Amino acid sequence: MANGRGKTLVIHSVKLPVMDGVAEYGQMGLGPEGAYRNREFAGEAIRSEIRELWKEDVVFDPQTSGGLLLAVPSDEADQLAAELGKMDISGGIIGTVTELQDKYVIFD
């Protein structure tokens, strides 16, 4: 999404929703093998400033539990989140798109 447009996605890790129990299991070092392959694949395109190792593992977890990332114009984001809420669909603003920085994706 960012690579082809010369942009950077800045994802705010504190805004990422996680299921109950994920932090506890992650702190025990339990996670899928695919997360490590995803991290390796993304490699040089990503910079992580996440301080908790378990949360960094979560962002690379291949099991999204139906998760979906949408990029919408910033002036429409709040309205979209409200409309999703009316339909009992969980949604929220977890980041922004900026001009290209040193990486295509930054987790802060």
Model region roles, listed by residue range:
Residues M1-D108:
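Glycine-/charge-enriched secondary-structure boundary and capping motifs
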